[in-house]
């Protein structure tokens, strides 16, 4: 592999943005997986599709409208689940289909699918701008700082919600915070893998890491390592062979999962 591609400015932006998104998705995704909200990222991504379509129709930067729609959608999922005693999976399914339906209707008003729409559907990390990179880094830093500051409360409410309530932890507020941060993370990640494959970044590295049977911190580190590896190698391979970055990244993640499953089946993973 020629190292010349590493000298390109657009590749620097793509790799920096990709690594930041990989770390962010791994951390937020781990909390979602442990809370049995694995499909949450998919639902928010599909709902944000409606926001993207709305932004394109209104002539506004699509990600701004997508952020607004995704946050509102995330809060709606939580409210439906809590108030109407509907299971998390069911409320997620409702939101997922609603977002896609709304997006398709809005797109039909704007004259159909365009190149811009396809870039959001399938990702366009190699085209990320300087402003996008700065925004991604700022949001990643802000969310990680919040998680570090509230680490114990978030972790406690994730593993034992009832006991956390007894201990005086504001579980409901923590839940809304997690949902809010997840919504921000989803839209931020759309530029990397697009709306259609976003859940892969949240779920696959974490499922792979969990199979190693380590503690929470070790699992998070393993997940981030796998995610960063898939993103970096995926971006480089996609450029060299002129193939889609999103699909390449996801296939690499699936490959790591398959290797881990093989190692586990062979009894080579220690249980700690």
Where are these regions (language model features)?
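Membrane-helix/interface signature in polytopic inner-membrane proteins
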Residues: 145-178
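Transmembrane helix-bundle core of multi-pass membrane transporters
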Residues: 4-13, 84, 92-152
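Membrane-interfacial amphipathic/re-entrant helices at transmembrane-helix boundaries
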Residues: 1-23, 271-272
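Short loop segments and helix-boundary regions at transmembrane helix junctions
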Residues: 30-113, 209-221, 238-241, 264-266
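Transmembrane alpha-helical segments in multi-pass inner-membrane proteins
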Residues: 192, 198-247
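C-terminal binding/interaction regions
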Residues: 2-7, 121-125, 226-263
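Loop-to-transmembrane alpha-helix initiation sites
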Residues: 14-17, 62-70, 89-93, 136-137, ...
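Membrane-interface capping segments at transmembrane-helix boundaries
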Residues: 152-153, 262-272
